[in-house]
UniProtKB/Swiss-Prot annotation:
Additional record remark: Reaction mechanism of ThiL seems to utilize a direct, inline transfer of the gamma-phosphate of ATP to TMP rather than a phosphorylated enzyme intermediate.
Catalyses which reaction(s): thiamine phosphate + ATP = thiamine diphosphate + ADP
Transmembrane feature ranges: none
Binding, Mg(2+) 5: D233
GO terms of biological process kind: thiamine biosynthetic process; thiamine diphosphate biosynthetic process
Binding residues annotated for Mg(2+) 2, in chain numbering: D51, D80
Protein name: Thiamine-monophosphate kinase
UniProt record similarity statement: Belongs to the thiamine-monophosphate kinase family.
Length: 333
């Protein structure tokens, strides 16, 4: 079809078959020819996760370009696989829904980001589906093989160390910076912190390296069991989910909140650290010997508290229950 110069191709003009034909370059030869994806049989257990990214809920074109959207779609799913004991990424399928007026360049950018993330973290684009819709939506299903670690939220035990694999609040700060939020304009945020925060929001890193280190430093005679989740919905929610599943109390040391070295002080900044969301760090409850080995092997990890017998809740070390700041808590609905 001939196009006038400077006129963008839109999905309505291309049609489904041409869209699928253009997406072939992101997959292995023949992968898209059939309605199913053939995966070779594995003797190991499979772990599978499905996540959605919805425009104006999980991303905005004001703050996130198409490449970043594709990257983020992969990273969110692989983060969930990592906190379930991922050994190797097999691949993903992609369900795409978008208005027919969507430019092809947007779709191409998203799949470029998807491919870049898979190239870095492993796995292939196995297939998927596309449809016309009122809102841009990506639905990703990720598949991987499970390693020897049995990571379940219900595995936390009294006496465990509560550890996270990295700092929190960066993604929320990055979003604020991209939106020119008055909060971030009222304080001198160091340039290095700005760079880290914006990258954390636009190109999150699933905690695969942290998981691999956790695996390597397990004491020899210790069982392969630990409690873990990721902090995609915020650090506090991650801690509370471990408490609920394990029926334990988490005692958190306020002085040990996992913050970037240049993180400002103040209640708002503590709230972002606790509840900003989309940090994608491992939050793990580990027996003391294993915890100490992981802390030594990976300097970016931080012990933020202990688990003890008691009701399923998170509390400060002074005995006060950690209260949620509802205006900052990350919610899907």
């Amino acid at each position: 079809m001939l196009k006038e110069e400077n006129t963008q191709e839109i999905l309505h003009d291309l049609g489904e078959q041409e869209i699928l034909n253009r997406l072939r370059k992101y997959m292995d030869y023949g992968q898209i020819d059939d309605d199913t994806a053939l995966i070779k049989s594995y003797k190991k257990e499979l772990i599978i996760n499905t996540d959605m990214l919805v425009e104006d809920v999980h991303f905005s074109e004001i703050t996130t370009n198409p490449n970043h959207i594709g990257w983020k779609a992969v990273a969110t799913n692989l983060s969930d696989l990592a906190c379930s004991g991922l050994e190797e990424v097999i691949g993903i399928t992609v369900g795409l829904s978008a208005p027919s007026s969507t430019p092809w360049s947007w779709v191409d950018g998203v799949y470029t980001g998807i491919k870049a993330a898979l190239n870095k973290f492993g796995g292939k684009l196995l297939g998927g589906d596309c449809s016309n819709g009122k809102q841009k939506t990506l639905c990703i299903t990720a598949l991987g093989t499970k390693g020897p670690l049995n990571l379940h939220r219900s595995n936390a035990r009294p006496g465990d160390y509560l550890i996270t694999s990295g700092p929190h609040g960066l993604s929320r700060l990055g979003l604020s910076l991209l939106l020119s939020d008055p909060i971030t304009k009222s304080i001198n945020v160091p340039n290095l912190l700005k760079e880290h925060a914006i990258k954390a929001h636009q190109e999150p890193q699933p905690p695969i390296k942290a998981l691999q280190t956790l695996l390597k430093c397990k004491p020899y005679a210790m069982p392969w069991n630990a409690a873990a989740t990721d902090s995609s919905d915020g650090l506090l929610e991650a801690i509370e989910s471990l408490c609920r599943s394990s029926n334990c109390t988490a005692v958190v040391d306020h002085k040990n909140l996992p913050k970037h070295a240049d993180w400002p002080s103040g209640k708002q900044w503590n709230d972002w650290c606790l509840e900003g969301g989309e940090d994608f760090e491992l939050v793990v409850s580990l027996p003391p010997n294993w915890a100490k080995a992981w802390l030594k092997a990976m300097p970016c990890t931080k012990a933020i508290g202990r688990m003890k017998e008691g009701p399923a809740k998170a509390m400060w070390s002074n005995g006060e229950t950690i209260q949620k700041a509802m205006d900052t808590k990350f919610e899907h609905f």
